[in-house]
Amino acid sequence: MGPQNRNTSFAPDLNPPQDHVSLNYSYGDYDLPLGEDEDVTKTQTFFAAKIVIGVALAGIMLVCGIGNFVFIAALARYKKLRNLTNLLIANLAISDFLVAIVCCPFEMDYYVVRQLSWAHGHVLCASVNYLRTVSLYVSTNALLAIAIDRYLAIVHPLKPRMNYQTASFLIALVWMVSILIAVPSAYFTTETILVIVKNQEKIFCGQIWSVDQQLYYKSYFLFVFGLEFVGPVVTMTLCYARISQELWFKAVPGFQTEQIRKRLRCRRKTVLLLMGILTAYVLCWAPFYGFTIVRDFFPTVVVKEKHYLTAFYVVECIAMSNSMINTICFVTVKNNTMKYFKKMLRLHWRPSHYGSKSSADLDLKTSGVPATEEVDCIRLK
């Protein structure tokens, strides 16, 4: 079957009438070295990359699926956990949880089982790509909102904090911006049959921009790169730099009680954790954006490299693994969510005559608390 006779932004153009396959590479996310004698998906390099990708996807499904479910369940059950920072973290948890249980199984089948061949139809192809893109932007925007919230709470403690209505508006804004910006990833996603080697076809699933839309694609990518990576990283870096100056290099006037010192240690621990998360975010996503820039704006640098497709998927895998770091840091380190979850399970299976006392002691009411309540370090008694 002859592929479409058009140049694309995410797949190469094949011209079937010719005796041999002619490639006109452009700005591709999933360009396959077509028409070569050797199937790149059968090489040892791709086999090793497939193992790495499979392990990473399995880790994402396990860590993000279970970890974020535990956090969401604990947050819904215990009002003590519901402060503004945790409400923002909940956005990360929800988006990563959806990716872990919805996207990753299909990606495991696409990358590892079928080795870059899609078998689930156009609707699921577009939906999986769209949901994964929305999750990335939600995570980025939520991390940015958390950094700004910490900045206002620590550097400007006397200014009024956000109330519940403002926090709800901010959370809605995080999702609306992410959903709207990611629309092109769904609109331009399609299935395309590509001939990798002679008489061997694979069904490509990804974004395809026609040759006359390359300028729009470049503009869109640069817009997203600035709005969802450079801008947030610079803003978060400035926020945490100013917070660090406030917590470590500013003398606290007056006598410091044990409670004040404990609060300061708590805030320092939280900020160190958040700076570590920012560092992990940059280390995971910078290679992905860097590779994409080189591939889309300087295509001759990579298209001649035999294993550049394998390299791209490994880079993409590293980027996706950032969700595991977020889950481990936010869910298990910061809030001791597992302790709350274990308490919840013990309470659920405890005999009924102990139920009322346990509920009162553990503060299990599901009514909300003010979004301005600050709990930097939560510990069970």
Curated annotation (Swiss-Prot):
InterPro entries: GPCR_Rhodpsn (IPR000276), GPCR_Rhodpsn_7TM (IPR017452), NPY_rcpt (IPR000611)
Main location class: membrane
S-S bridge residues: C125-C205
Designated gene of the protein: Prokr2
Side Cytoplasmic, residues: 73-86, 155-168, 242-270, 332-381
Subunit composition and interactions: Homodimer.
Name of the protein: Prokineticin receptor 2
Intervals, Extracellular compartment: 1-51, 108-133, 190-220, 292-310
